[in-house]
Structures are given as structure tokens and as C-alpha cells.
Swiss-Prot record:
Its EC number is 2.8.1.8. This is Lipoyl synthase. Pathway: Protein modification; protein lipoylation via endogenous pathway; protein N(6)-(lipoyl)lysine from octanoyl-[acyl-carrier-protein]: step 2/2. It is an enzyme of class 2 (transferase). GO terms for cellular component: cytoplasm. One of its GO terms (molecular function) is 4 iron, 4 sulfur cluster binding. It catalyses: [[Fe-S] cluster scaffold protein carrying a second [4Fe-4S](2+) cluster] + N(6)-octanoyl-L-lysyl-[protein] + 2 oxidized [2Fe-2S]-[ferredoxin] + 2 S-adenosyl-L-methionine + 4 H(+) = [[Fe-S] cluster scaffold protein] + N(6)-[(R)-dihydrolipoyl]-L-lysyl-[protein] + 4 Fe(3+) + 2 hydrogen sulfide + 2 5'-deoxyadenosine + 2 L-methionine + 2 reduced [2Fe-2S]-[ferredoxin]. HAMAP family: Lipoyl_synth. Residues 93-312 form the Radical SAM core domain. [4Fe-4S] cluster 1 binds at C81, C86, C92, S323. Pfam families: LIAS_N, Radical_SAM. NCBIfam families: lipA, PRK05481.1, PRK12928.1. The keyword Cytoplasm applies. It comes from Stenotrophomonas maltophilia (strain R551-3).
Length: 336
């Protein structure tokens, strides 16, 4: 495989403020610079790479986006599409699909790539599962992705709320297939507790994103652990061999080609069935800079390599995201 010819830049890391520099108020969102300033690492000014021609987002016409947003607000629901500033939001909303984000809009982590707000979350909304179940039924969705912020403040990491949402959706829409995109449930005894709870009503697809190569974890996913995430995927699969597992990688954060391939091998070695690979795009000037734009040829080479490794489905392309066309990905893994 050949290395991308797209220009790349070096990354300069500077020491961040202490995460405990100021008390957090429950439910108050910290965004952009306020969030990243609490991270263990920050990024010195770096030249901005011009987006190449293959990074383009289509904005559809019509009222589909506004109609879906209105329905979500009516039911007090949140989508990760909006909260994380996903570049595919117009296409997905235009097709009437969305990835629902449960457990609030405030995350206990401070990942440098993510545009979701950081802070001290409020308690879970006990009415959210019922609202979600009704909304999915009203929209007639056949495939639903449910994700969440990290909830390190909860003893089970939010696993019971996931199960409550799965149960509510299946009660109203028994034919709907459900994919969950979970946090890592990191903490003493938390993974075991979460997996035990998820066994009450497992999803149709279990997704947890590895996000990046292990050497970049400190800069990209402070508070997370590469091996822990691999173990979560493997342990879930061991308990539910019939449920496809899935993970995703972002490119453009400073990784090398061989590091990407090594991470793909690690995922297969931990019994992951499906993989998504896409280009990282910087949400704001405060976030981790884009250090490289990988070419479509690179993504095709990684797709081919993924199938060589034995993944049942590989979605690899500049605009691919974990939940993008998730129903199509699931069909490739035998979910119908």
C-alpha cells in the first residue's frame, strides 16, 4: 500500500490546565476552548490544512431537516448528529434517520476531537426511554442507532439506561433493529457490571469506537485506555457471539499507515466484525488540528486490507462516520 501524498503537518503539544481548575455546575455545558482548556494537553497554533476536493458535504433542499429537528425537540430528544457537529447531518436528516444520544448532552470526558460539551451531567431523565420509544415508532424507523455521552458519574456507566431504551423501542417497534454505540464503561468493576446489565436485553449490533491508534490516546482520548476498549468489545462478543460487534477509527490525527493496519489487526484479534474508517474534521479552532487528509485511494487500500483480515463489513472513506448508513453496514454483517 502506498502512503498518502496529501500534505501533513507536525503537532505541537502544550501543557493544559488542571481539570479541577474550577468547579463544574451540574448541567452547564463547556464547549470549544472552555472544554479543551480543561484537558491535560492542548495544541499550539498550527497551520490549517486546506480541505481537499474529496471532502465535500451535500446540503439537501426541502424541509426534512427542519421537520426532524422539530420532532426531536418536541420529544425532548437529542441526536449526536447535532451535538457532535457531524458533517453528514444534512444527508442523514434528509433521509429521516438519526443517531439518538441518550443520558444528556454533557459528557464527563474531554476528548480533544469531540464537539460534545463537557461538564457535570444532570441525573438521567427517567422519561427518556419512553419518549425515545414513541419517537422511533412515530417515525417508523426500521434501524436505530442509540449512543450516549460518557457517564463516569454513574456506577454502571449508564448501562441500565441503555437497556431501558432498548426495551422501550422494542415494545413499540418490535421489528426495528437497534445498534448501540456505547462509552467504554471504564472504572473498577464497571465493565463487568455494564455487561451484566446489557445481557438483560442485548442490542442487534454492539458498537464501541476505538477512535485512534494507541500511541495517540493521551492526546486524543484522555481518560480512556486502548486495551480497555479492546477488552470491552471482546468481552461483549464472548457473551453474545450471535451479535455483530463494530468499531471505528478516525484518520488525520497524526497516525501512520502501519499504525492504522496494526489497530485493525488488534480489532480483529478481539473478535470485532465490522469497522468504519473516516477522516477526522476539526470541529473548532480549539480542538485537535487536522494533521493530514488521507486520500480516497488510501481508504480503498484500507477497505481491501480490512476484508483481507476477515471483517464482515468495512466502511472506509473520507466522509464515513460510525453511524453513517449504519443499516447498510449491519446488513453486510447479516442483520436483517
Amino acid at each position: 500500500m502506498t502512503e498518502s501524498t496529501a500534505r501533513s503537518i507536525p503537532l505541537q503539544i502544550v501543557q493544559g490546565d488542571s481539570p479541577s481548575a474550577a468547579p463544574l455546575q451540574a448541567g452547564v455545558k463547556q464547549l470549544g476552548g472552555d472544554k479543551i482548556n480543561r484537558s491535560p494537553v492542548q495544541f499550539a497554533d498550527a497551520p490549517v490544512l486546506r480541505k481537499p476536493s474529496w471532502i465535500r458535504v451535500r446540503i439537501p433542499s426541502g424541509n426534512a431537516v427542519q421537520n426532524l429537528k422539530a420532532k426531536l425537540r418536541e420529544n425532548r430528544l437529542v441526536t449526536v448528529c447535532e451535538e457532535a457537529s457531524c458533517p453528514n447531518i444534512h444527508e442523514c436528516f434528509g433521509h429521516g434517520t438519526a443517531t439518538f444520544m441518550i443520558l444528556g448532552e454533557v459528557c464527563t470526558r474531554r476528548c480533544s476531537f469531540c464537539d460534545v460539551a463537557h461538564g457535570r451531567p444532570k441525573p438521567p431523565d427517567a422519561n427518556e426511554p419512553a419518549s425515545l420509544g414513541q419517537t422511533v415508532a412515530d417515525m417508523g424507523l426500521k434501524y436505530v442507532v442509540v449512543t450516549s455521552v460518557d457517564r463516569d458519574d454513574l456506577r454502571d456507566g449508564g448501562a441500565q439506561h441503555f437497556v431501558d431504551c432498548i426495551s422501550a423501542i422494542r415494545e413499540k417497534s418490535p421489528g426495528t433493529r437497534i445498534e448501540v454505540l456505547t462509552p467504554d464503561f471504564r472504572g473498577k468493576g464497571r465493565m463487568e457490571r455494564a455487561l451484566e446489565i446489557l445481557a438483560q436485553n442485548p442490542p442487534d449490533v454492539f458498537n464501541h469506537n476505538i477512535e485512534t491508534v494507541p500511541d495517540l490516546y493521551r492526546n486524543v482520548r484522555p481518560g480512556a485506555d486502548y486495551q480497555w476498549s479492546l477488552n470491552l468489545l471482546k468481552n461483549f462478543k464472548a457473551q453474545h457471539p450471535e451479535v455483530p460487534t463494530k468499531s471505528g477509527i478516525m484518520l488525520g490525527l497524526g497516525e501512520e499507515f502501519e499504525q492504522i493496519k496494526a489497530t485493525m489487526r488488534d480489532l480483529r484479534a478481539h473478535d470485532v466484525d465490522m469497522i468504519t474508517i473516516g477522516q477526522y474534521l476539526q470541529p473548532t479552532a480549539h480542538h485537535h488540528p487536522v494533521l493530514k487528509y488521507w486520500t480516497p485511494e488510501d481508504y480503498k487500500a484500507l477497505e481491501d486490507y480490512g476484508y483481507e483480515l476477515g471483517f464482515s463489513h468495512v466502511a472506509s472513506g473520507p466522509m464515513v462516520r460510525s453511524s453513517y448508513h449504519a443499516d447498510v453496514q449491519a446488513k453486510g454483517a447479516g442483520v436483517s
